[in-house]
């Protein structure tokens, strides 16, 4: 470390030790908590299946910042820069539309070989991979229904796509030695008030059971399901609601995905984690930033991001919660978006690990809520930034906003040529 950072580090460690926090133990734990970065920030959820395709499914990437990735080589290059600017362990989350093939591949015919380059790249960079079937931006999802479709042939197509996706996910886990979390999200819903809310959910229930019927090694693959309140064009009814998927995950013992933008604006997923963990074996978190709706803005180091991290740490959910990000902002440099959001998630985890939780819990048990509030507020002023800077330097990444210099240089040399 440089002298100034080392001096600040030593003083900060003393301050935290005075309140009973072991900084070295906190950093050791932080190094066991990978954050899964989402590939789709790099190209506005376009994928490689049809570069001229239109994004559908009630989601939207707004903006036209130049330099978005147009193929897998460009996307991996962009990711490599982002990864080099973020300290600690990372993973990469892929959608099925990011397959690589010289010939068109139907979604229900995808195979592990279509993702072999991603696996080789992940091995090189010591990354785990996660996966998602892509039930959107396709002619057979154009009417707003996939796994709950009333047409059995269309429904079967999406069942087969999800089944094929599970095999790809298991391939990731087997090849990389770390389980791939495969999350199923579907856009199914209606713009206006439906007469029959039950039948689509009955079809979805049966379809999901068929999707997960093949037994896969849990050391290689983990199933997750994700709810949503509404989407563009599905404002009045969403088949896969919170209640539906909470019941499904609890009864089938799959993981449950909680997306920060998929609930009413007055709801927060940090308050849902402890309840859900009583009933499901695992949680997948999609940390995002909804602005008035599921806008998928870049994650900030704000109160909710901190609360999410604190819930994981306070309840020792390290082995049961999988931390992923889900945002896509096309109005700013896409590599910078990755770096900002992922560094913020890691900062939140570090701050949570530096909290004197045992001391605060004892105050709560004694009913001393005055001291609890006082210490909660005072610990916000402890020098966690000095620990963060030391952690960045130990991981050979820029300590502060100097990471932006690398992004600007890459933008001038590489992105401007696209």
From Swiss-Prot:
Cofactor: binding details: Binds 1 Mn(2+) ion per subunit.
Protein name per its UniProtKB record: L-rhamnose isomerase
Residues given in the record as Mn(2+) binding sites: 262, 294, 296
Quaternary state and interactors: Homotetramer.
Entry's EC annotation: 5.3.1.14
An MF annotation (GO) of this entry: L-rhamnose isomerase activity
Cofactor: Mn(2+)
GO BP of this protein: L-lyxose metabolic process; rhamnose catabolic process
GO cellular component terms listed in the entry, alphabetical order: cytoplasm
Presence of keyword Metal-binding: yes
Top EC group: isomerase
Catalytic activity entry: L-rhamnopyranose = L-rhamnulose
InterPro entries xrefs: L-rhamnose_isomerase (IPR050337), Rhamnose_isomerase (IPR009308), Xyl_isomerase-like_sf (IPR036237)
Cytoplasm listed as a keyword: yes
Annotated organism of origin: Yersinia pestis
Function: Catalyzes the interconversion of L-rhamnose and L-rhamnulose.
Keywords: Cytoplasm, Isomerase, Manganese, Metal-binding, Rhamnose metabolism
Family stated for the protein in its record: Belongs to the rhamnose isomerase family.
Pathway note: Carbohydrate degradation; L-rhamnose degradation; glycerone phosphate from L-rhamnose: step 1/3
Localization annotation: Cytoplasm
């Amino acid at each position: 470390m440089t002298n100034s950072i080392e001096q600040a580090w030593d003083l900060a460690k003393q301050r935290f030790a005075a309140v009973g926090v072991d900084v070295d133990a906190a950093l050791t734990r932080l190094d066991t908590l990978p954050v899964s970065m989402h590939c789709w920030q790099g190209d506005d959820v376009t994928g490689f299946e049809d570069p001229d395709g239109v994004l559908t499914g009630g989601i939207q990437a707004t903006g036209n910042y130049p330099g978005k990735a147009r193929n897998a080589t460009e996307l991996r290059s962009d990711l490599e820069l982002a990864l080099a600017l973020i300290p600690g362990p990372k993973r990469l989350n892929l959608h099925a539309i990011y397959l690589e093939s010289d010939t068109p591949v139907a979604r229900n015919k995808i195979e592990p070989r279509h993702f072999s380059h991603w696996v080789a790249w992940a091995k090189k960079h010591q990354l785990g991979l996660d996966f998602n079937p892509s039930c959107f931006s396709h002619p057979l999802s154009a009417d707003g229904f996939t796994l709950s479709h009333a047409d059995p042939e269309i429904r079967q197509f999406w069942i087969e796509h999800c089944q094929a996706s599970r095999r790809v996910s298991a391939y990731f886990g087997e090849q990389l030695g770390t389980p791939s979390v495969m999350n199923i999200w579907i856009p199914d819903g209606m713009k206006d008030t439906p007469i029959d809310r039950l039948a689509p959910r009955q079809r979805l229930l049966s379809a999901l059971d068929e999707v997960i019927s093949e037994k896969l090694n849990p050391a290689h693959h983990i199933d997750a399901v994700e709810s949503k309140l509404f989407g563009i064009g599905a404002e009045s009814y969403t088949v896969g609601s919170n209640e539906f998927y909470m019941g499904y995950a609890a009864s089938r013992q799959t993981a449950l995905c909680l997306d920060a933008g998929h609930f009413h604006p007055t709801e927060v997923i940090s308050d849902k984690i402890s309840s859900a963990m009583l009933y499901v074996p695992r949680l997948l978190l999609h940390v995002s930033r909804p602005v008035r709706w599921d806008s998928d803005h870049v994650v900030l180091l704000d109160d909710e991001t901190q609360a999410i991290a604190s819930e994981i740490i306070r309840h020792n959910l390290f082995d049961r919660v999988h931390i992923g990000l889900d945002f896509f902002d096309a109005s700013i440099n896409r590599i910078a978006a990755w770096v900002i959001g992922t560094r913020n998630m890691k900062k939140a985890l570090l701050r949570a690990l530096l909290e004197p939780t045992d001391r605060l819990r004892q105050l709560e048990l004694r009913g001393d809520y005055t001291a609890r509030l006082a210490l909660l507020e005072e610990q916000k002023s402890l020098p966690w930034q000095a620990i963060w800077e030391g952690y960045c330097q130990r991981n050979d990444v820029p300590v502060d906003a100097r990471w932006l210099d690398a992004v600007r240089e890459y933008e001038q040399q590489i992105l401007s040529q696209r």
